[in-house]
Amino acid sequence: MPDVLSNDLLQKMDAYWRAANYLSVGQIYLQDNPLLDQKLQLDHIKPRLLGHWGTTPGLNLLYVHLNRLITEHDLDMIYITGPGHGGPGLVANAYLEGTYTERYPAIERSRNGMQRLFRQFSWPHGVPSHVSPETPGSIHEGGELGYSLAHAYGAAFDNPNLIVACVVGDGEAETGALATSWHSNKFLNPARDGAVLPILHLNGFKIANPTVLARITPQELTDLMRGYGYEPHFVEGDDPAVVHQTLAATLERVLGEIRAIQDKARNHGDTERPRWPMIVMRTPKGWTGPKQVDGKPVEGTWRAHQVPIADFKNPEHLTLLEDWMRSYRPDELFDATGKLRDELQALAPTGRRRMSANPHANGGELLEPLSLPDFHDYAVTLTGPGALKAEATRVLGTFLRDVMKNSLESENFRLFGPDETASNRLDAVLQVSPKEWMAAIEDVDVDLSPDGRVMEVLSEHLCQGWLEGYLLTGRHGFFSCYEAFIHIIDSMFNQHAKWLKACATIPWRKPIASLNYLLTSHVWRQDHNGFSHQDPGFIDHVANKKSNVVRIYLPPDANCLLSVADHCLRSRNYVNLIVAGKQPEWQWLDIDAAVRHCTTGAGIWHWASDEGEPDVVMACAGDVPTVETLAAVKLLREYVPDIKIRVVNVVDLMVLQPSSEHPHGLDDRRFDELFTTDKPVIFAFHGYPWLIHRLTYRRRNHVNIHVRGYKEEGTTTTPFDMVVLNDLDRYRLALDAILRIPRLADQRDAATSRYWATMQRHKLYIGEHGDDLPEVRDWRWSA
């Protein structure tokens, strides 16, 4: 392979790499003496040594080489680092490019600024150890491994001029999420999308073990990558001069391949799935660090993973660290004021071409509002509450269809789901855009196209990762999923919620579109698939996060779902969780009433309630609990004709918390107006009942709140038997009310006997007929 770099350029790039490595080591170790003007002393060393060195020199090497590529070819490129524990390297490069000082003026490019840069790293009130939101140029923290490549592809969708360089750590490559992410190339259309350049960094080791991909044969690794649909290019070695030349030549080659692929697709109509290039870079872990510490090998071993030298009570360790840092020859890199020398500064791109300043890595700078149709136009027309049934998600699908239609020109909206768009009854969107598919298409296939905007792959990890990458680079999206299986990405949600929480404290991070989940095919209507498909616990999971990040909505009908979805698609910097059924259910509110109800988040349904002070409050949250509550109200009026009932429906779950805990929370006065201060409250809840207790435990009437919900009982059975198994059925709710109204004490025994007789009749009927009792199946509301 011919040399690409002149000797002069090679020397300068090596010096830039040394500068990044020097700054990285300084962040891990030093709190003073940043330029080593003095002999290194113990009080120059941080008292607690935190950070990860092992991956950092490889990340720094790639950064300087990508900078050369950007500068010479005027590329629009961002950099995603799967091994995000190499945080000091990305901070160092943002500092060398000048972006860090622009974002944080106190960290100026001087001796004092460098000292502050070093001291703040992994320091109280400083910056975290990973490639966190505080790091300019980052859209991927990399603290939890496995999501880098999915984020990279999400960033590349609908960004035709963008190249996303994505470093995949060889440890990260062992995760399930990353393993499936290689298949993202079957969904990237070179005619309209950008390019992803995966760079598999084989440094050989994880924390304390070798990595699988570093220990298989080169032929096996080649076959694996080719099997995934890539053309691997290998860069290997431990001689910096050789690796510099090889890496530079390889990057030129892969850039040429990327441009050729895009040219064929964009200018010659080539619709075949291309074999995209990728790089396998094999360099030592902890390269340029100490060869040995205390007689044990470090460079090129797992011992280089975190802090290679510790315990500075040993004076030999102090000497070893000083020798290591001086090996970078800082006097050749920085002038007497601590500023990077001009001839090295000239290597970095400028302005928005800097990867640390690229607006795609601060997607809110590029965000444009969605062109949303008027959701009122899609409303279910009602003559009164309970007048008809509708499939809520099918109604929503017609709205999303036109959201998609309105965004075809702007290309800033995609719908994501794990092979469930049709199952979840959102398939109206396919009238406007098919499903994206770059693999082979056969005659039996329908709604597949290289130009699709509906993203379906049977991996919740990929759907979540793609969507996050898409949102973080300034676009909009919507993710529908079976309720039970969204748990597959519990931890991915955690990381995104943490990212948003951190961004809220960083002034230069511009708001991005919210991550919107629609969970359907939910617990109460998974009677046909059984116990494995029945789990509403994602609600609890989301509720654990910061109140300035999460929102949870349980619309009781289609019109409320429309109102909620429109609101969520307009929102910024939230995770919005919507739970709604897809089966035909009774509809309760006309569109104007639905908007009012969703705006307040909870309210008395006067049309179902008695005026005045109630004997009992029948509360509900969720579509099936709402039906069961209203059916229980009818039963109670049959059983106790003079009973006074108040029906309260909750659509925004967070209103149950005090306003001091959540911005949507009701103040105590308003909460008491709904739920009273001393009357029994029978609360039928979609999820696990203890969440309601948790949200309301500070309320004055909490002692009287009795919650029914899912209690981990389920099987393949009838729809009504599902609520019976969990004591959420109308008969149980009616009995609960009678048992808790003091003046009805004399009716409790009879009510209990009636309840058990009904349950016996129910169980005998479903066992014989395989369907629910006619009085349940054919029930409808009447005022």
From Swiss-Prot:
Cofactors named for this entry: thiamine diphosphate
GO MF term set: aldehyde-lyase activity
Organism expressing this protein natively: Rhodopseudomonas palustris (strain TIE-1)
Stated name of the protein: Probable phosphoketolase
Keywords assigned: Lyase, Thiamine pyrophosphate
Entry-linked Pfam families: XFP, XFP_C, XFP_N
NCBIfam families in the record: PRK05261.1-1, PRK05261.1-2, PRK05261.1-4, PRK05261.1-6
SUPFAM superfamilies: Thiamin diphosphate-binding fold (THDP-binding)
